[in-house]
Amino acid sequence: MKNLVLGCFEGFNATILAYGQTGSGKTFTMGSGYTIGLSREDIGLIPRVIEFIFQEVEARKQKAEFIIKCSFLEIYNEELHDLLEEGNSTMMDRIMPAKKEISIREEKNGTISVYGLKEVTVKSGEEMAACLDSGSSQRITSSTMMNA
């Protein structure tokens, strides 16, 4: 994980993807569930990445200025959902959105860009963790035959 984050400071993109069947521990492993009250050993990957990002910002702040923006995208049944957009918390809001459309596009140079996604400027790990908690509370969850 640290090498991926360090690569971002050098201008590279990085992605960590959790994929698996229902109940396999993706949310727990990534740490996008509520982390309040969990021990240091039990927090997931995302809170650890947040902590490391801000450690690196602190170590490098004499050489560069940093602006960190946070967004939270959910892809559910091939539909894109902005989890930081206010008023996006109910299933009805998602079925009949009154907001701008989110799209993912490949640019001419091959980079992938997301348009229409809310970005929140954060100045600390605590602010970024608050975005994570806020967005996590808006994720779509539903039972499947695996839960039965």
Provide a role label for each language-model segment.
Residues K26:
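Conserved lysine of the Walker
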Residues M1-Q21, G31-A148:
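P-loop NTPase "switch/coupling" elements that transmit nucleotide state to mechanical/effector output
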